[in-house]
Amino acid sequence: MDSINEFTSKKLSIEGNISSGKTDVLNILRNINNVVSFHDVEDRYTPIEKELIRKFHENPSRWSYALQTHYCMKRVRMHLECFVPSRVNILERSIFSDRYVFAEAATALGYMDDPEWALYCKQHDWYTDKLEIQFDGIIYLRTIPESCKERINEKSITEKNYPNISIDYLKTLHEKHELWLTQCKKVPVLIIDGEEDFIFDPCAKKKLINEVTEFINSI
């Protein structure tokens, strides 16, 4: 099955670790009829964000709160601006992964202290409550940290100044993804094996499209 009910209006997010393959999957899913995808690239390479990310990985305790606050606002803006009526809208990450994965990981690793965490949560709760931010479903691209690190190392060769992200940080992010999405009760979650080669394996690509299509039609 690769057809979605016509005039379906839904909003989903695709979640996963850094370099888990979300962008490649989104490029494939946008070929499904009635699907429109929004990539997390609008600000990624602006000078301000590149500098903020660089500073975070050099000194996470100093810059974690600033980075998480920036991304919280960015997710809110994506939620408000990236929506096409009567279409299935799939966003790369959400304000919820910003909190339950990245902000919680930063706190667990000691990058944000208790006052910063409290301020972040207060801001996050205000946005989600006042703006009534909700999603119809989540697609979780489950990729082991070692694979993510290998892909990051490859990117660091081709992209100048690509941040050196530690395997320990990736493992913590993976643990937070697992804790959040394997126990999530508020919204349906589809878990996809991120170790599959969706680019060069036609069978894996077809399976991905079928699973996502069936998931969207079921919610």
From Swiss-Prot:
ATP binds at residues 16-24. The keyword rRNA-binding does not apply. Pfam families: dNK (PF01712). The active site is at 92 (proton acceptor). It comes from Fowlpox virus (strain NVSL). GO terms for molecular function: ATP binding; deoxycytidine kinase activity. Its EC number is 2.7.1.74. It catalyses: 2'-deoxycytidine + a ribonucleoside 5'-triphosphate = dCMP + a ribonucleoside 5'-diphosphate + H(+). Substrate binds at residues 40, 68, 93, 98. Keywords: ATP-binding, Kinase, Nucleotide-binding, Transferase. Belongs to the DCK/DGK family. SUPFAM superfamilies: P-loop containing nucleoside triphosphate hydrolases (SSF52540). This is Probable deoxycytidine kinase FPV059. It comes from the Viruses. InterPro entries: DCK/DGK, Deoxyribonucleoside_kinase, DNK_dom, P-loop_NTPase. Gene3D superfamilies: P-loop containing nucleotide triphosphate hydrolases.
